[in-house]
Amino acid sequence: MFLAQEIIRKKRDGHPLTEEEIRFFINGVRDNTVSEGQIAALAMTIYFHDMTMPERVALTLAMRDSGTVLNWKSLNLNGPIVDKHSTGGVGDVTSLMLGPMVAACGGYVPMISGRGLGHTGGTLDKLEAIPGFDIFPDDEKFRDIIRHVGVAIIGQTNSLAPADKRFYATRDITATVDSIPLITASILGKKLAEGLDALVMDVKVGSGAFMPTYQKSEELAESIVQVANGAGCQTTALLTDMNEVLASSAGNAVEVREAVQFLTGEYRNPRLFEVTMALCVEMLVSGRLADSRQQARQKLQDVLDNGKAAEVFARMVAAQNGPTDFVENYNKYLPTAVLSKPVFAEKAGFVTEMDTRALGMSVVTLGGGRRKATDAIDYSVGLSEIAALGTEINTDTPLAMIHANSEKSWQEAAAEVRKAMVIGETKRETSPMVYRQVSE
């Protein structure tokens, strides 16, 4: 039998905690036998003293085991259970293509996603722009969709990693969110509860990233890869660029529109294509659905070219109570904003810099994102046709198309977009999309 305060004292004095001590504390978080003050104290000691790799693995597994861990054995699936997690960014709509692409190649993707907060968009919000789309199917329905379609994207239920929810809420109000061991356990506790065989982690770098520097992003990627593999899940990570909006659009309905166009081949933003492909390749290789990256890439290109990936997406939407003809008629179903008009730069030149975070916040200004978790959002608003870095701009070339619900919010967002996009004299070199791959 342990005492929470003795566990806090031990960590405060710089000693590593045992697996039993960590489990006792996390179970207490779940059962409400550990107080909010004690959670705050332990979080702060971890923030200052860090955690060894065995401690991080133990914390992650304790978070995972605080609730239900999905088990797919009874379904006798003929492929691996694989998923992707992104640290979030702006215009990061990869999940909507990646899930169907990997499923079309024989993987099973039970993706449990989140909502948007602040400048980062949320996959669930994007999907809820589709009329009728149900992000909370019951357990039987969820398993049924995975068995028959191969991919489902749903919201986190209270039964998955419940200790994390309480632990995170305390971190949020005690300035202990940005601790690498705590971020690692929070992300992986939820992801590993999906019962995965393999995971790929997309860690963003740059002005729209969650981590402030390349070094911090790299540190997080390395921590996640080591801890997830230590917990028995084949995991790699990619460090990808978020110095500009990833897709050509940012918002909810506008990003779903772009995802459908990507899957059908109507329009594929080259940067979005590169990142999505790179992540899918990792998933196929880690899940042993391909012998090499080259073979994986070919398989993925094939399911895009022959329409299988688009078909899987259509079946997922229908299975989750969306329209059965959504892919063919997405424009009919997706909400459109009252006002759509372009914003222009005040001078000619090249787009040399982009404050991606500020562009994400302009979507919040329009009503398409949240400042706090309880905010309602307008699915129709956002930005589209965003000029990429290096684009030559004159006073007739728009920086972006702004979709707003009033002239006032259009004007506010236009000012933010102009400020966020720097126009310079010379064309800058574009940065790579994938900086490096992190594996064990």
Swiss-Prot record:
Q: In which pathway does it act?
A: Pyrimidine metabolism; dTMP biosynthesis via salvage pathway; dTMP from thymine: step 1/2
Molecular-function annotations in GO: 1,4-alpha-oligoglucan phosphorylase activity; thymidine phosphorylase activity
Q: Which reaction does it catalyse?
A: thymidine + phosphate = 2-deoxy-alpha-D-ribose 1-phosphate + thymine
Task: Tell me the keywords, alphabetical order.
Answer: Glycosyltransferase, Transferase
Name the GO cellular-component terms: cytosol
Q: Which InterPro entries match?
A: Glycosyl_Trfase_fam3 (IPR000312), Glycosyl_Trfase_fam3_N_dom (IPR017459), Glycosyl_Trfase_fam3_N_dom_sf (IPR036320), Nuc_phospho_transferase (IPR035902), PYNP-like_C_sf (IPR036566), PYNP_C (IPR013102), Pyrmidine_PPas_bac/euk (IPR018090), Pyrmidine_PPase_CS (IPR017872)
How does this chain assemble? Homodimer.
Q: What does this protein do?
A: The enzymes which catalyze the reversible phosphorolysis of pyrimidine nucleosides are involved in the degradation of these compounds and in their utilization as carbon and energy sources, or in the rescue of pyrimidine bases for nucleotide synthesis.
Family, similarity comment? Belongs to the thymidine/pyrimidine-nucleoside phosphorylase family.
**Protein name as catalogued:** Thymidine phosphorylase
| Source organism (scientific name) | Proteus mirabilis (strain HI4320)
